[in-house]
């Protein structure tokens, strides 16, 4: 119980909330509070239908560094309009500092992922993305990788950012994260 209370006081949590197991004794209260989502919705699951995502056979990722966040954001807008980007994560200066990224000081990065069912399709996706990215000033050369170890390292870095940034905030404060389109 103390460990759960302590962890919740120092870390903002996304995903399943287990704090109700500590705060409430009544089973109904525990279940009701476990079903409260990040937007404050309460729900009851009586049935679920899962739709799986297509698993592409070819993927590539790139970690693109920009000198400032404004240029990175302009690039995101341009990519959204015309490039086959499967996912894109913006990592600001504080995020990169929190995971000890040593690429450069004060940078912003975009972690971009593209996918296809063929090698030719993937190459076409990368070319289309690079055509857009080429319109912007990067800190270093753009490099797409299909190497699973290299790309896993980038995505692992990204996964570690939220706990790292959350750990730098003052005790008792809340880190707010939201996905935007």
What are these regions (language model features)?
Residues 1-181:
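Noncatalytic alpha-helical scaffold of FAD-dependent oxidoreductases
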């Amino acid at each position: 119980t103390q460990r759960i209370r302590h962890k919740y006081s120092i870390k903002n949590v996304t995903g399943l909330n287990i704090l109700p197991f500590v705060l409430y004794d009544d089973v109904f209260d525990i279940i009701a509070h476990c079903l409260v989502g990040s937007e404050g919705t309460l729900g009851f699951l009586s049935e679920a239908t899962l739709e799986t995502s297509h698993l592409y056979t070819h993927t590539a990722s790139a970690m693109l560094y920009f000198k400032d966040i404004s240029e990175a954001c302009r690039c995101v807008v341009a990519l959204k309009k015309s490039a086959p980007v499967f996912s894109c994560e913006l990592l600001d200066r504080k995020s990169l500092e929190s995971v000890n990224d040593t690429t450069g000081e004060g940078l912003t990065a975009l972690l971009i992922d593209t996918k296809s069912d063929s090698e030719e399709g993937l190459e076409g996706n990368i070319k289309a993305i690079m055509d857009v990215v080429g319109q912007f000033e990067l800190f270093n050369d753009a490099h797409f990788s299909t190497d699973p170890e290299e790309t896993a390292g980038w995505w692992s870095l990204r996964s570690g950012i939220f706990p790292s940034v959350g750990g730098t905030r003052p005790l008792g404060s809340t880190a707010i994260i939201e996905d935007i389109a």
